């Protein structure tokens, strides 16, 4: 335990610039840019904003203000507009409820040309992890927002609040080809490491090793790669030097891989669907496995 704590202290000190902390300004990677390629003949789509409770509007204004400070969105004069939603997410360490602002890009997605780049096969990843002894999981800080949009594509992402009209400078969540762009970037950043000492699925990285020496050397190599490309990590979501980790809904140890019991319990507690919407939600949850 003492050796582990010493190692973690060394890593946190040596790579302190890698961790995104409260009130930090999120950096922008030099590894990729995102392009929104539209079908021929598409004209700007302008959808009326959804009606939202006043309390949610205040939360949206707070989040947009922070996005402006971080250089993620900017005031816009775009003819495009997609409506906003705000959805709950898991409470933070303080136990306070949190909300995520989401732009509904469904109409834009229908007019966007797709990208056939595949995501990794989760089953194949799990098949190769069970024989290792030491693991570290790394989570990218607001992953998509670390990628710039190509010049001229920002207006397509425009949205409105009671404070004004805005557009993204960085890659937002919900665009059709965002996962492909992010996965291609991470595959490039960690080239020749994926499949030998780590796997990456979008913004989630798992390092696996059979010895402490191998683990420590490979972790530094991965962190050096991320630093080179100006990519930041979310410290509270990282799991360092563990013999058991939770990754992509699975618990991984040197004894093998099993489904995360918390995810299984959630499925078991899910009420019997009574309409198509509930059935779709249930199917989306179980089909992951």
What are these regions (language model features)?
Residues 1-289:
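Retroelement reverse transcriptase polymerase core
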């Amino acid at each position: 335990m003492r050796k582990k704590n010493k190692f973690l202290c060394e890593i946190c000190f040596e790579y302190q610039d890698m961790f995104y902390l409260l009130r930090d300004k999120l950096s922008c990677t030099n590894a990729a840019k995102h392009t929104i390629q539209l079908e021929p003949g598409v004209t700007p789509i302008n959808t009326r904003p959804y009606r939202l409770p006043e309390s949610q509007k205040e939360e949206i204004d707070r989040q947009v203000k922070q996005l402006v400070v971080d250089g993620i969105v900017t005031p816009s004069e775009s003819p495009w507009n997609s409506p906003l939603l705000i959805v709950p997410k898991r409470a933070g360490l303080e136990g306070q409820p949190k909300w995520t602002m989401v732009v509904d890009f469904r109409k834009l997605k229908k007019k966007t040309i797709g990208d056939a780049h595949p995501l990794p096969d989760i089953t194949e990843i799990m098949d190769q992890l069970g024989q290792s002894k030491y693991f570290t999981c790394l989570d990218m800080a607001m992953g998509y927002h670390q990628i710039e949009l190509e010049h001229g594509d920002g207006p397509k992402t425009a949205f409105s609040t009671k404070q004004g009209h805005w557009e993204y400078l960085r890659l937002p969540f919900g665009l059709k080809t965002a996962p492909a762009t992010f996965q291609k970037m991470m595959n490039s950043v960690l080239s020749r490491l994926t499949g030998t000492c780590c796997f990456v699925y979008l913004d989630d990285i798992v390092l696996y090793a059979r010895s402490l020496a191998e683990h420590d050397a490979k972790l530094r190599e991965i962190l050096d790669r991320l630093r080179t490309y100006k990519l930041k990590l979310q410290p509270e979501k990282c799991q360092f030097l563990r013999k058991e980790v939770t990754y992509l809904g699975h618990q991984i140890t040197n004894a093998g891989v099993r489904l995360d019991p918390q995810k299984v319990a959630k499925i078991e507690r899910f009420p019997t669907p009574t309409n198509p919407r509930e059935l779709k939600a249930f199917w989306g949850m179980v089909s992951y496995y």
